[in-house]
């Protein structure tokens, strides 16, 4: 179901790890000699909004991806706490690079911030740290095929004591797909990621509107 869920947050000070097991990879296809397929997640917000007159500079830190999903191979969930990589089906870039680029590109168009950057952290007012904690396709007998994505977001203000966290949220979404195949799973992730970014934008817009001096 395409329902965005909000979950508990865990600070990124703790390194992202996983207790889930990985099964031996059985790549889809008839032979390991088959050419690999490469995928990207690409979302577009559309037109850029007018920038808020007192918007701040936001630094987007490199997105962190929890250990079992940070490699280029797509991953299926095939059982309780069991995941299986698909070596013949990979992201074109690392998930960290893909999500960082897409997140920055979306946020710069929201107009909430005067600028959204991915370098020169020290010139920014705010720092956004993001974690991808789930990124898999569901392929379990008796369960509906789905693309699952879960993300956590934290914004700190560099002008406050100890870079205090001023905004945090956790969002997840399960997108139903016809069949668990690599193209379907990636398309589901793309749909889900766009919905998560739209929800994040609404939350950020509300927060900064309510906390902007009138």
Show where each model-derived region lies:
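Short secondary-structure boundary motifs at beta->alpha junctions and helix caps
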Residues: 82-89, 159-201
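Soluble periplasmic/extracytoplasmic beta-strand elements of cell-envelope proteins
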Residues: 57-62, 75, 127-133, 148-154, ...
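Surface-exposed short loop/turn segments
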Residues: 22-49, 109-162, 179
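N-terminal leader/targeting helix
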Residues: 88-112
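Extracytoplasmic/secreted envelope proteins and their assembly/folding machinery
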Residues: 96, 100, 104, 190-193, ...
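A structural "domain/chain start" motif
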Residues: 20-96, 207-214
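Sec-dependent bacterial lipoprotein signal peptides
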Residues: 1-21
